[in-house]
Regions:
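Alpha/beta enzyme core
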Residues: 4-12, 28-53, 59-75, 84-212, ...
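An acidic- and aromatic-residue-enriched active-site/binding cleft used to recognize and process polar
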Residues: 144, 218, 263
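Histidine-centered catalytic micro-motifs
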Residues: 21-27, 80-85, 212-225, 258-260
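Short coil/turn segments at secondary-structure junctions
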Residues: 18, 50, 111-113, 283, ...
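Terminal accessory/targeting
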Residues: 10, 16-21
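C-terminal alpha-helical cap/extension of soluble enzyme domains
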Residues: 231, 242-330
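Short, N-terminal intrinsically disordered low-complexity segments that are rich in Pro/Gly
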Residues: 20-27, 52-55, 289
């Protein structure tokens, strides 16, 4: 099946009413875990790297590890996605490396922290759309603004998406998928009070726009993982995420792409802490990264089943980026 445009994966999900997880990666073990889970459940998958991950691992190193995931899993539809690109240059770099999808987050200025205005968002998004579509690459953008800060991205303040503005934004930019803000946030501390999402906003946006909708900040922060982290020496009091039933309701109401990063970090960290606590003599990285990889595979497989992605890997004939170039450049 190999590398496919994210647009195809999300449109198939929209047609059949399921969600697709987009799982953030920083290293080999995370990529292997995600792909093993995709094979186990026969799920299409989006593997995504943030600018922070690409800086940490080096753009080329991480990019080629992601390509290895495609090569080693020919029966699985895989999209390679840039998460929270901040400029046309960041998108170009990902496209040049072979990514099949890029996100441009024009809801913030190029520093990834300062809130932008509508005009700025439209201009930077349109420039990325015009460039990416020449290469058959999918473009995701964001309207509204999530709270929280993760991987150096975020202003800390939230701004719920205005449905009419979302409609105009899609018309003004020609973007392929739209991330909206309905009350989720980045990081492990998503709610200060009641866990409330603006499902009414999601429903209104879904009525107005026809393209796939994306939900960022969608980790569930399972209590058992927080308890395990804290049991083995961590300090994460009060961490809370989005309940799975909320995510499943969002999928039913029209979300196709669900971003997951924090949960993967927690699964690996809890396992590594456990290994070092119970076996302090261990020093071979394989002795702690191996169990962490297994734990993450289990977590991702459970999400693929809960999102409804499982069993859909063989549903459709894959499109190539060359195919998409013809679609975009008619």
């Amino acid at each position: 099946m190999a590398l496919v445009p994210m647009k195809q994966i999300l449109e198939e999900a929209k047609k059949k009413g399921y969600g697709v997880g987009a799982y953030n990666v920083n290293n080999m073990e995370q990529i292997q875990s995600i792909m093993a889970a995709a094979q186990e459940t026969q799920s299409p998958v989006i593997i995504q790297a943030s600018r922070g991950a690409l800086k940490y691992s080096n753009f080329t190193y991480l990019g080629y590890l992601m390509k290895a995931a495609v090569i080693e899993n020919p029966t699985i539809p895989v999209a390679m996605h840039l998460d929270h690109g901040n400029s046309l240059d960041s998108a170009k770099k990902a496209i040049d490396l072979g990514f099949s999808s890029v996100m441009i987050d024009g809801s913030l200025k190029e520093d990834g922290k300062t809130p932008s205005d509508y005009e700025y968002n439209v201009n930077v998004t349109r420039s990325v759309v015009e460039y990416a579509h020449k290469y058959g690459v999918t473009v995701e953008a964001e309207i509204g603004r999530l709270g929280g800060i993760e991987d150096g991205v975020g202003s800390g303040s939230a701004h719920i998406t205005d449905p009419q503005e979302a409609l105009q934004f899609v018309k003004d930019t020609g973007v392929d998928a739209l991330a909206i803000a309905i009350g989720t946030s980045h990081g492990a501390y998503k709610f200060k009070g009641a866990k409330v999402l603006a499902f009414d906003v999601l429903q209104e946006v879904r009525k107005l726009i026809d393209i796939p909708i994306v939900l960022h900040g969608a980790s569930s922060v399972p209590k058992e993982l927080i308890d395990a982290v804290n049991k083995y020496g961590g300090k994460m009091p009060g961490a809370e995420g989005v309940p799975m039933e909320h995510l499943q309701k969002a999928i039913q109401l029209g979300v196709q792409k669900i971003n997951v990063d924090t949960d993967g970090r927690l699964a690996m960290t809890a396992t590594i802490r456990k290994v070092f606590t119970e076996s302090p003599e261990k020093f071979d990285p394989r002795d702690y990264l191996g169990p962490a990889r297994t734990a993450l595979q289990g977590l991702i497989a459970s999400k693929m089943k809960a999102f409804g992605t499982a069993g859909h890997a063989s549903d459709y004939a894959p499109l190539t980026l060359e195919d998409m170039k013809k679609v975009y450049n008619k």
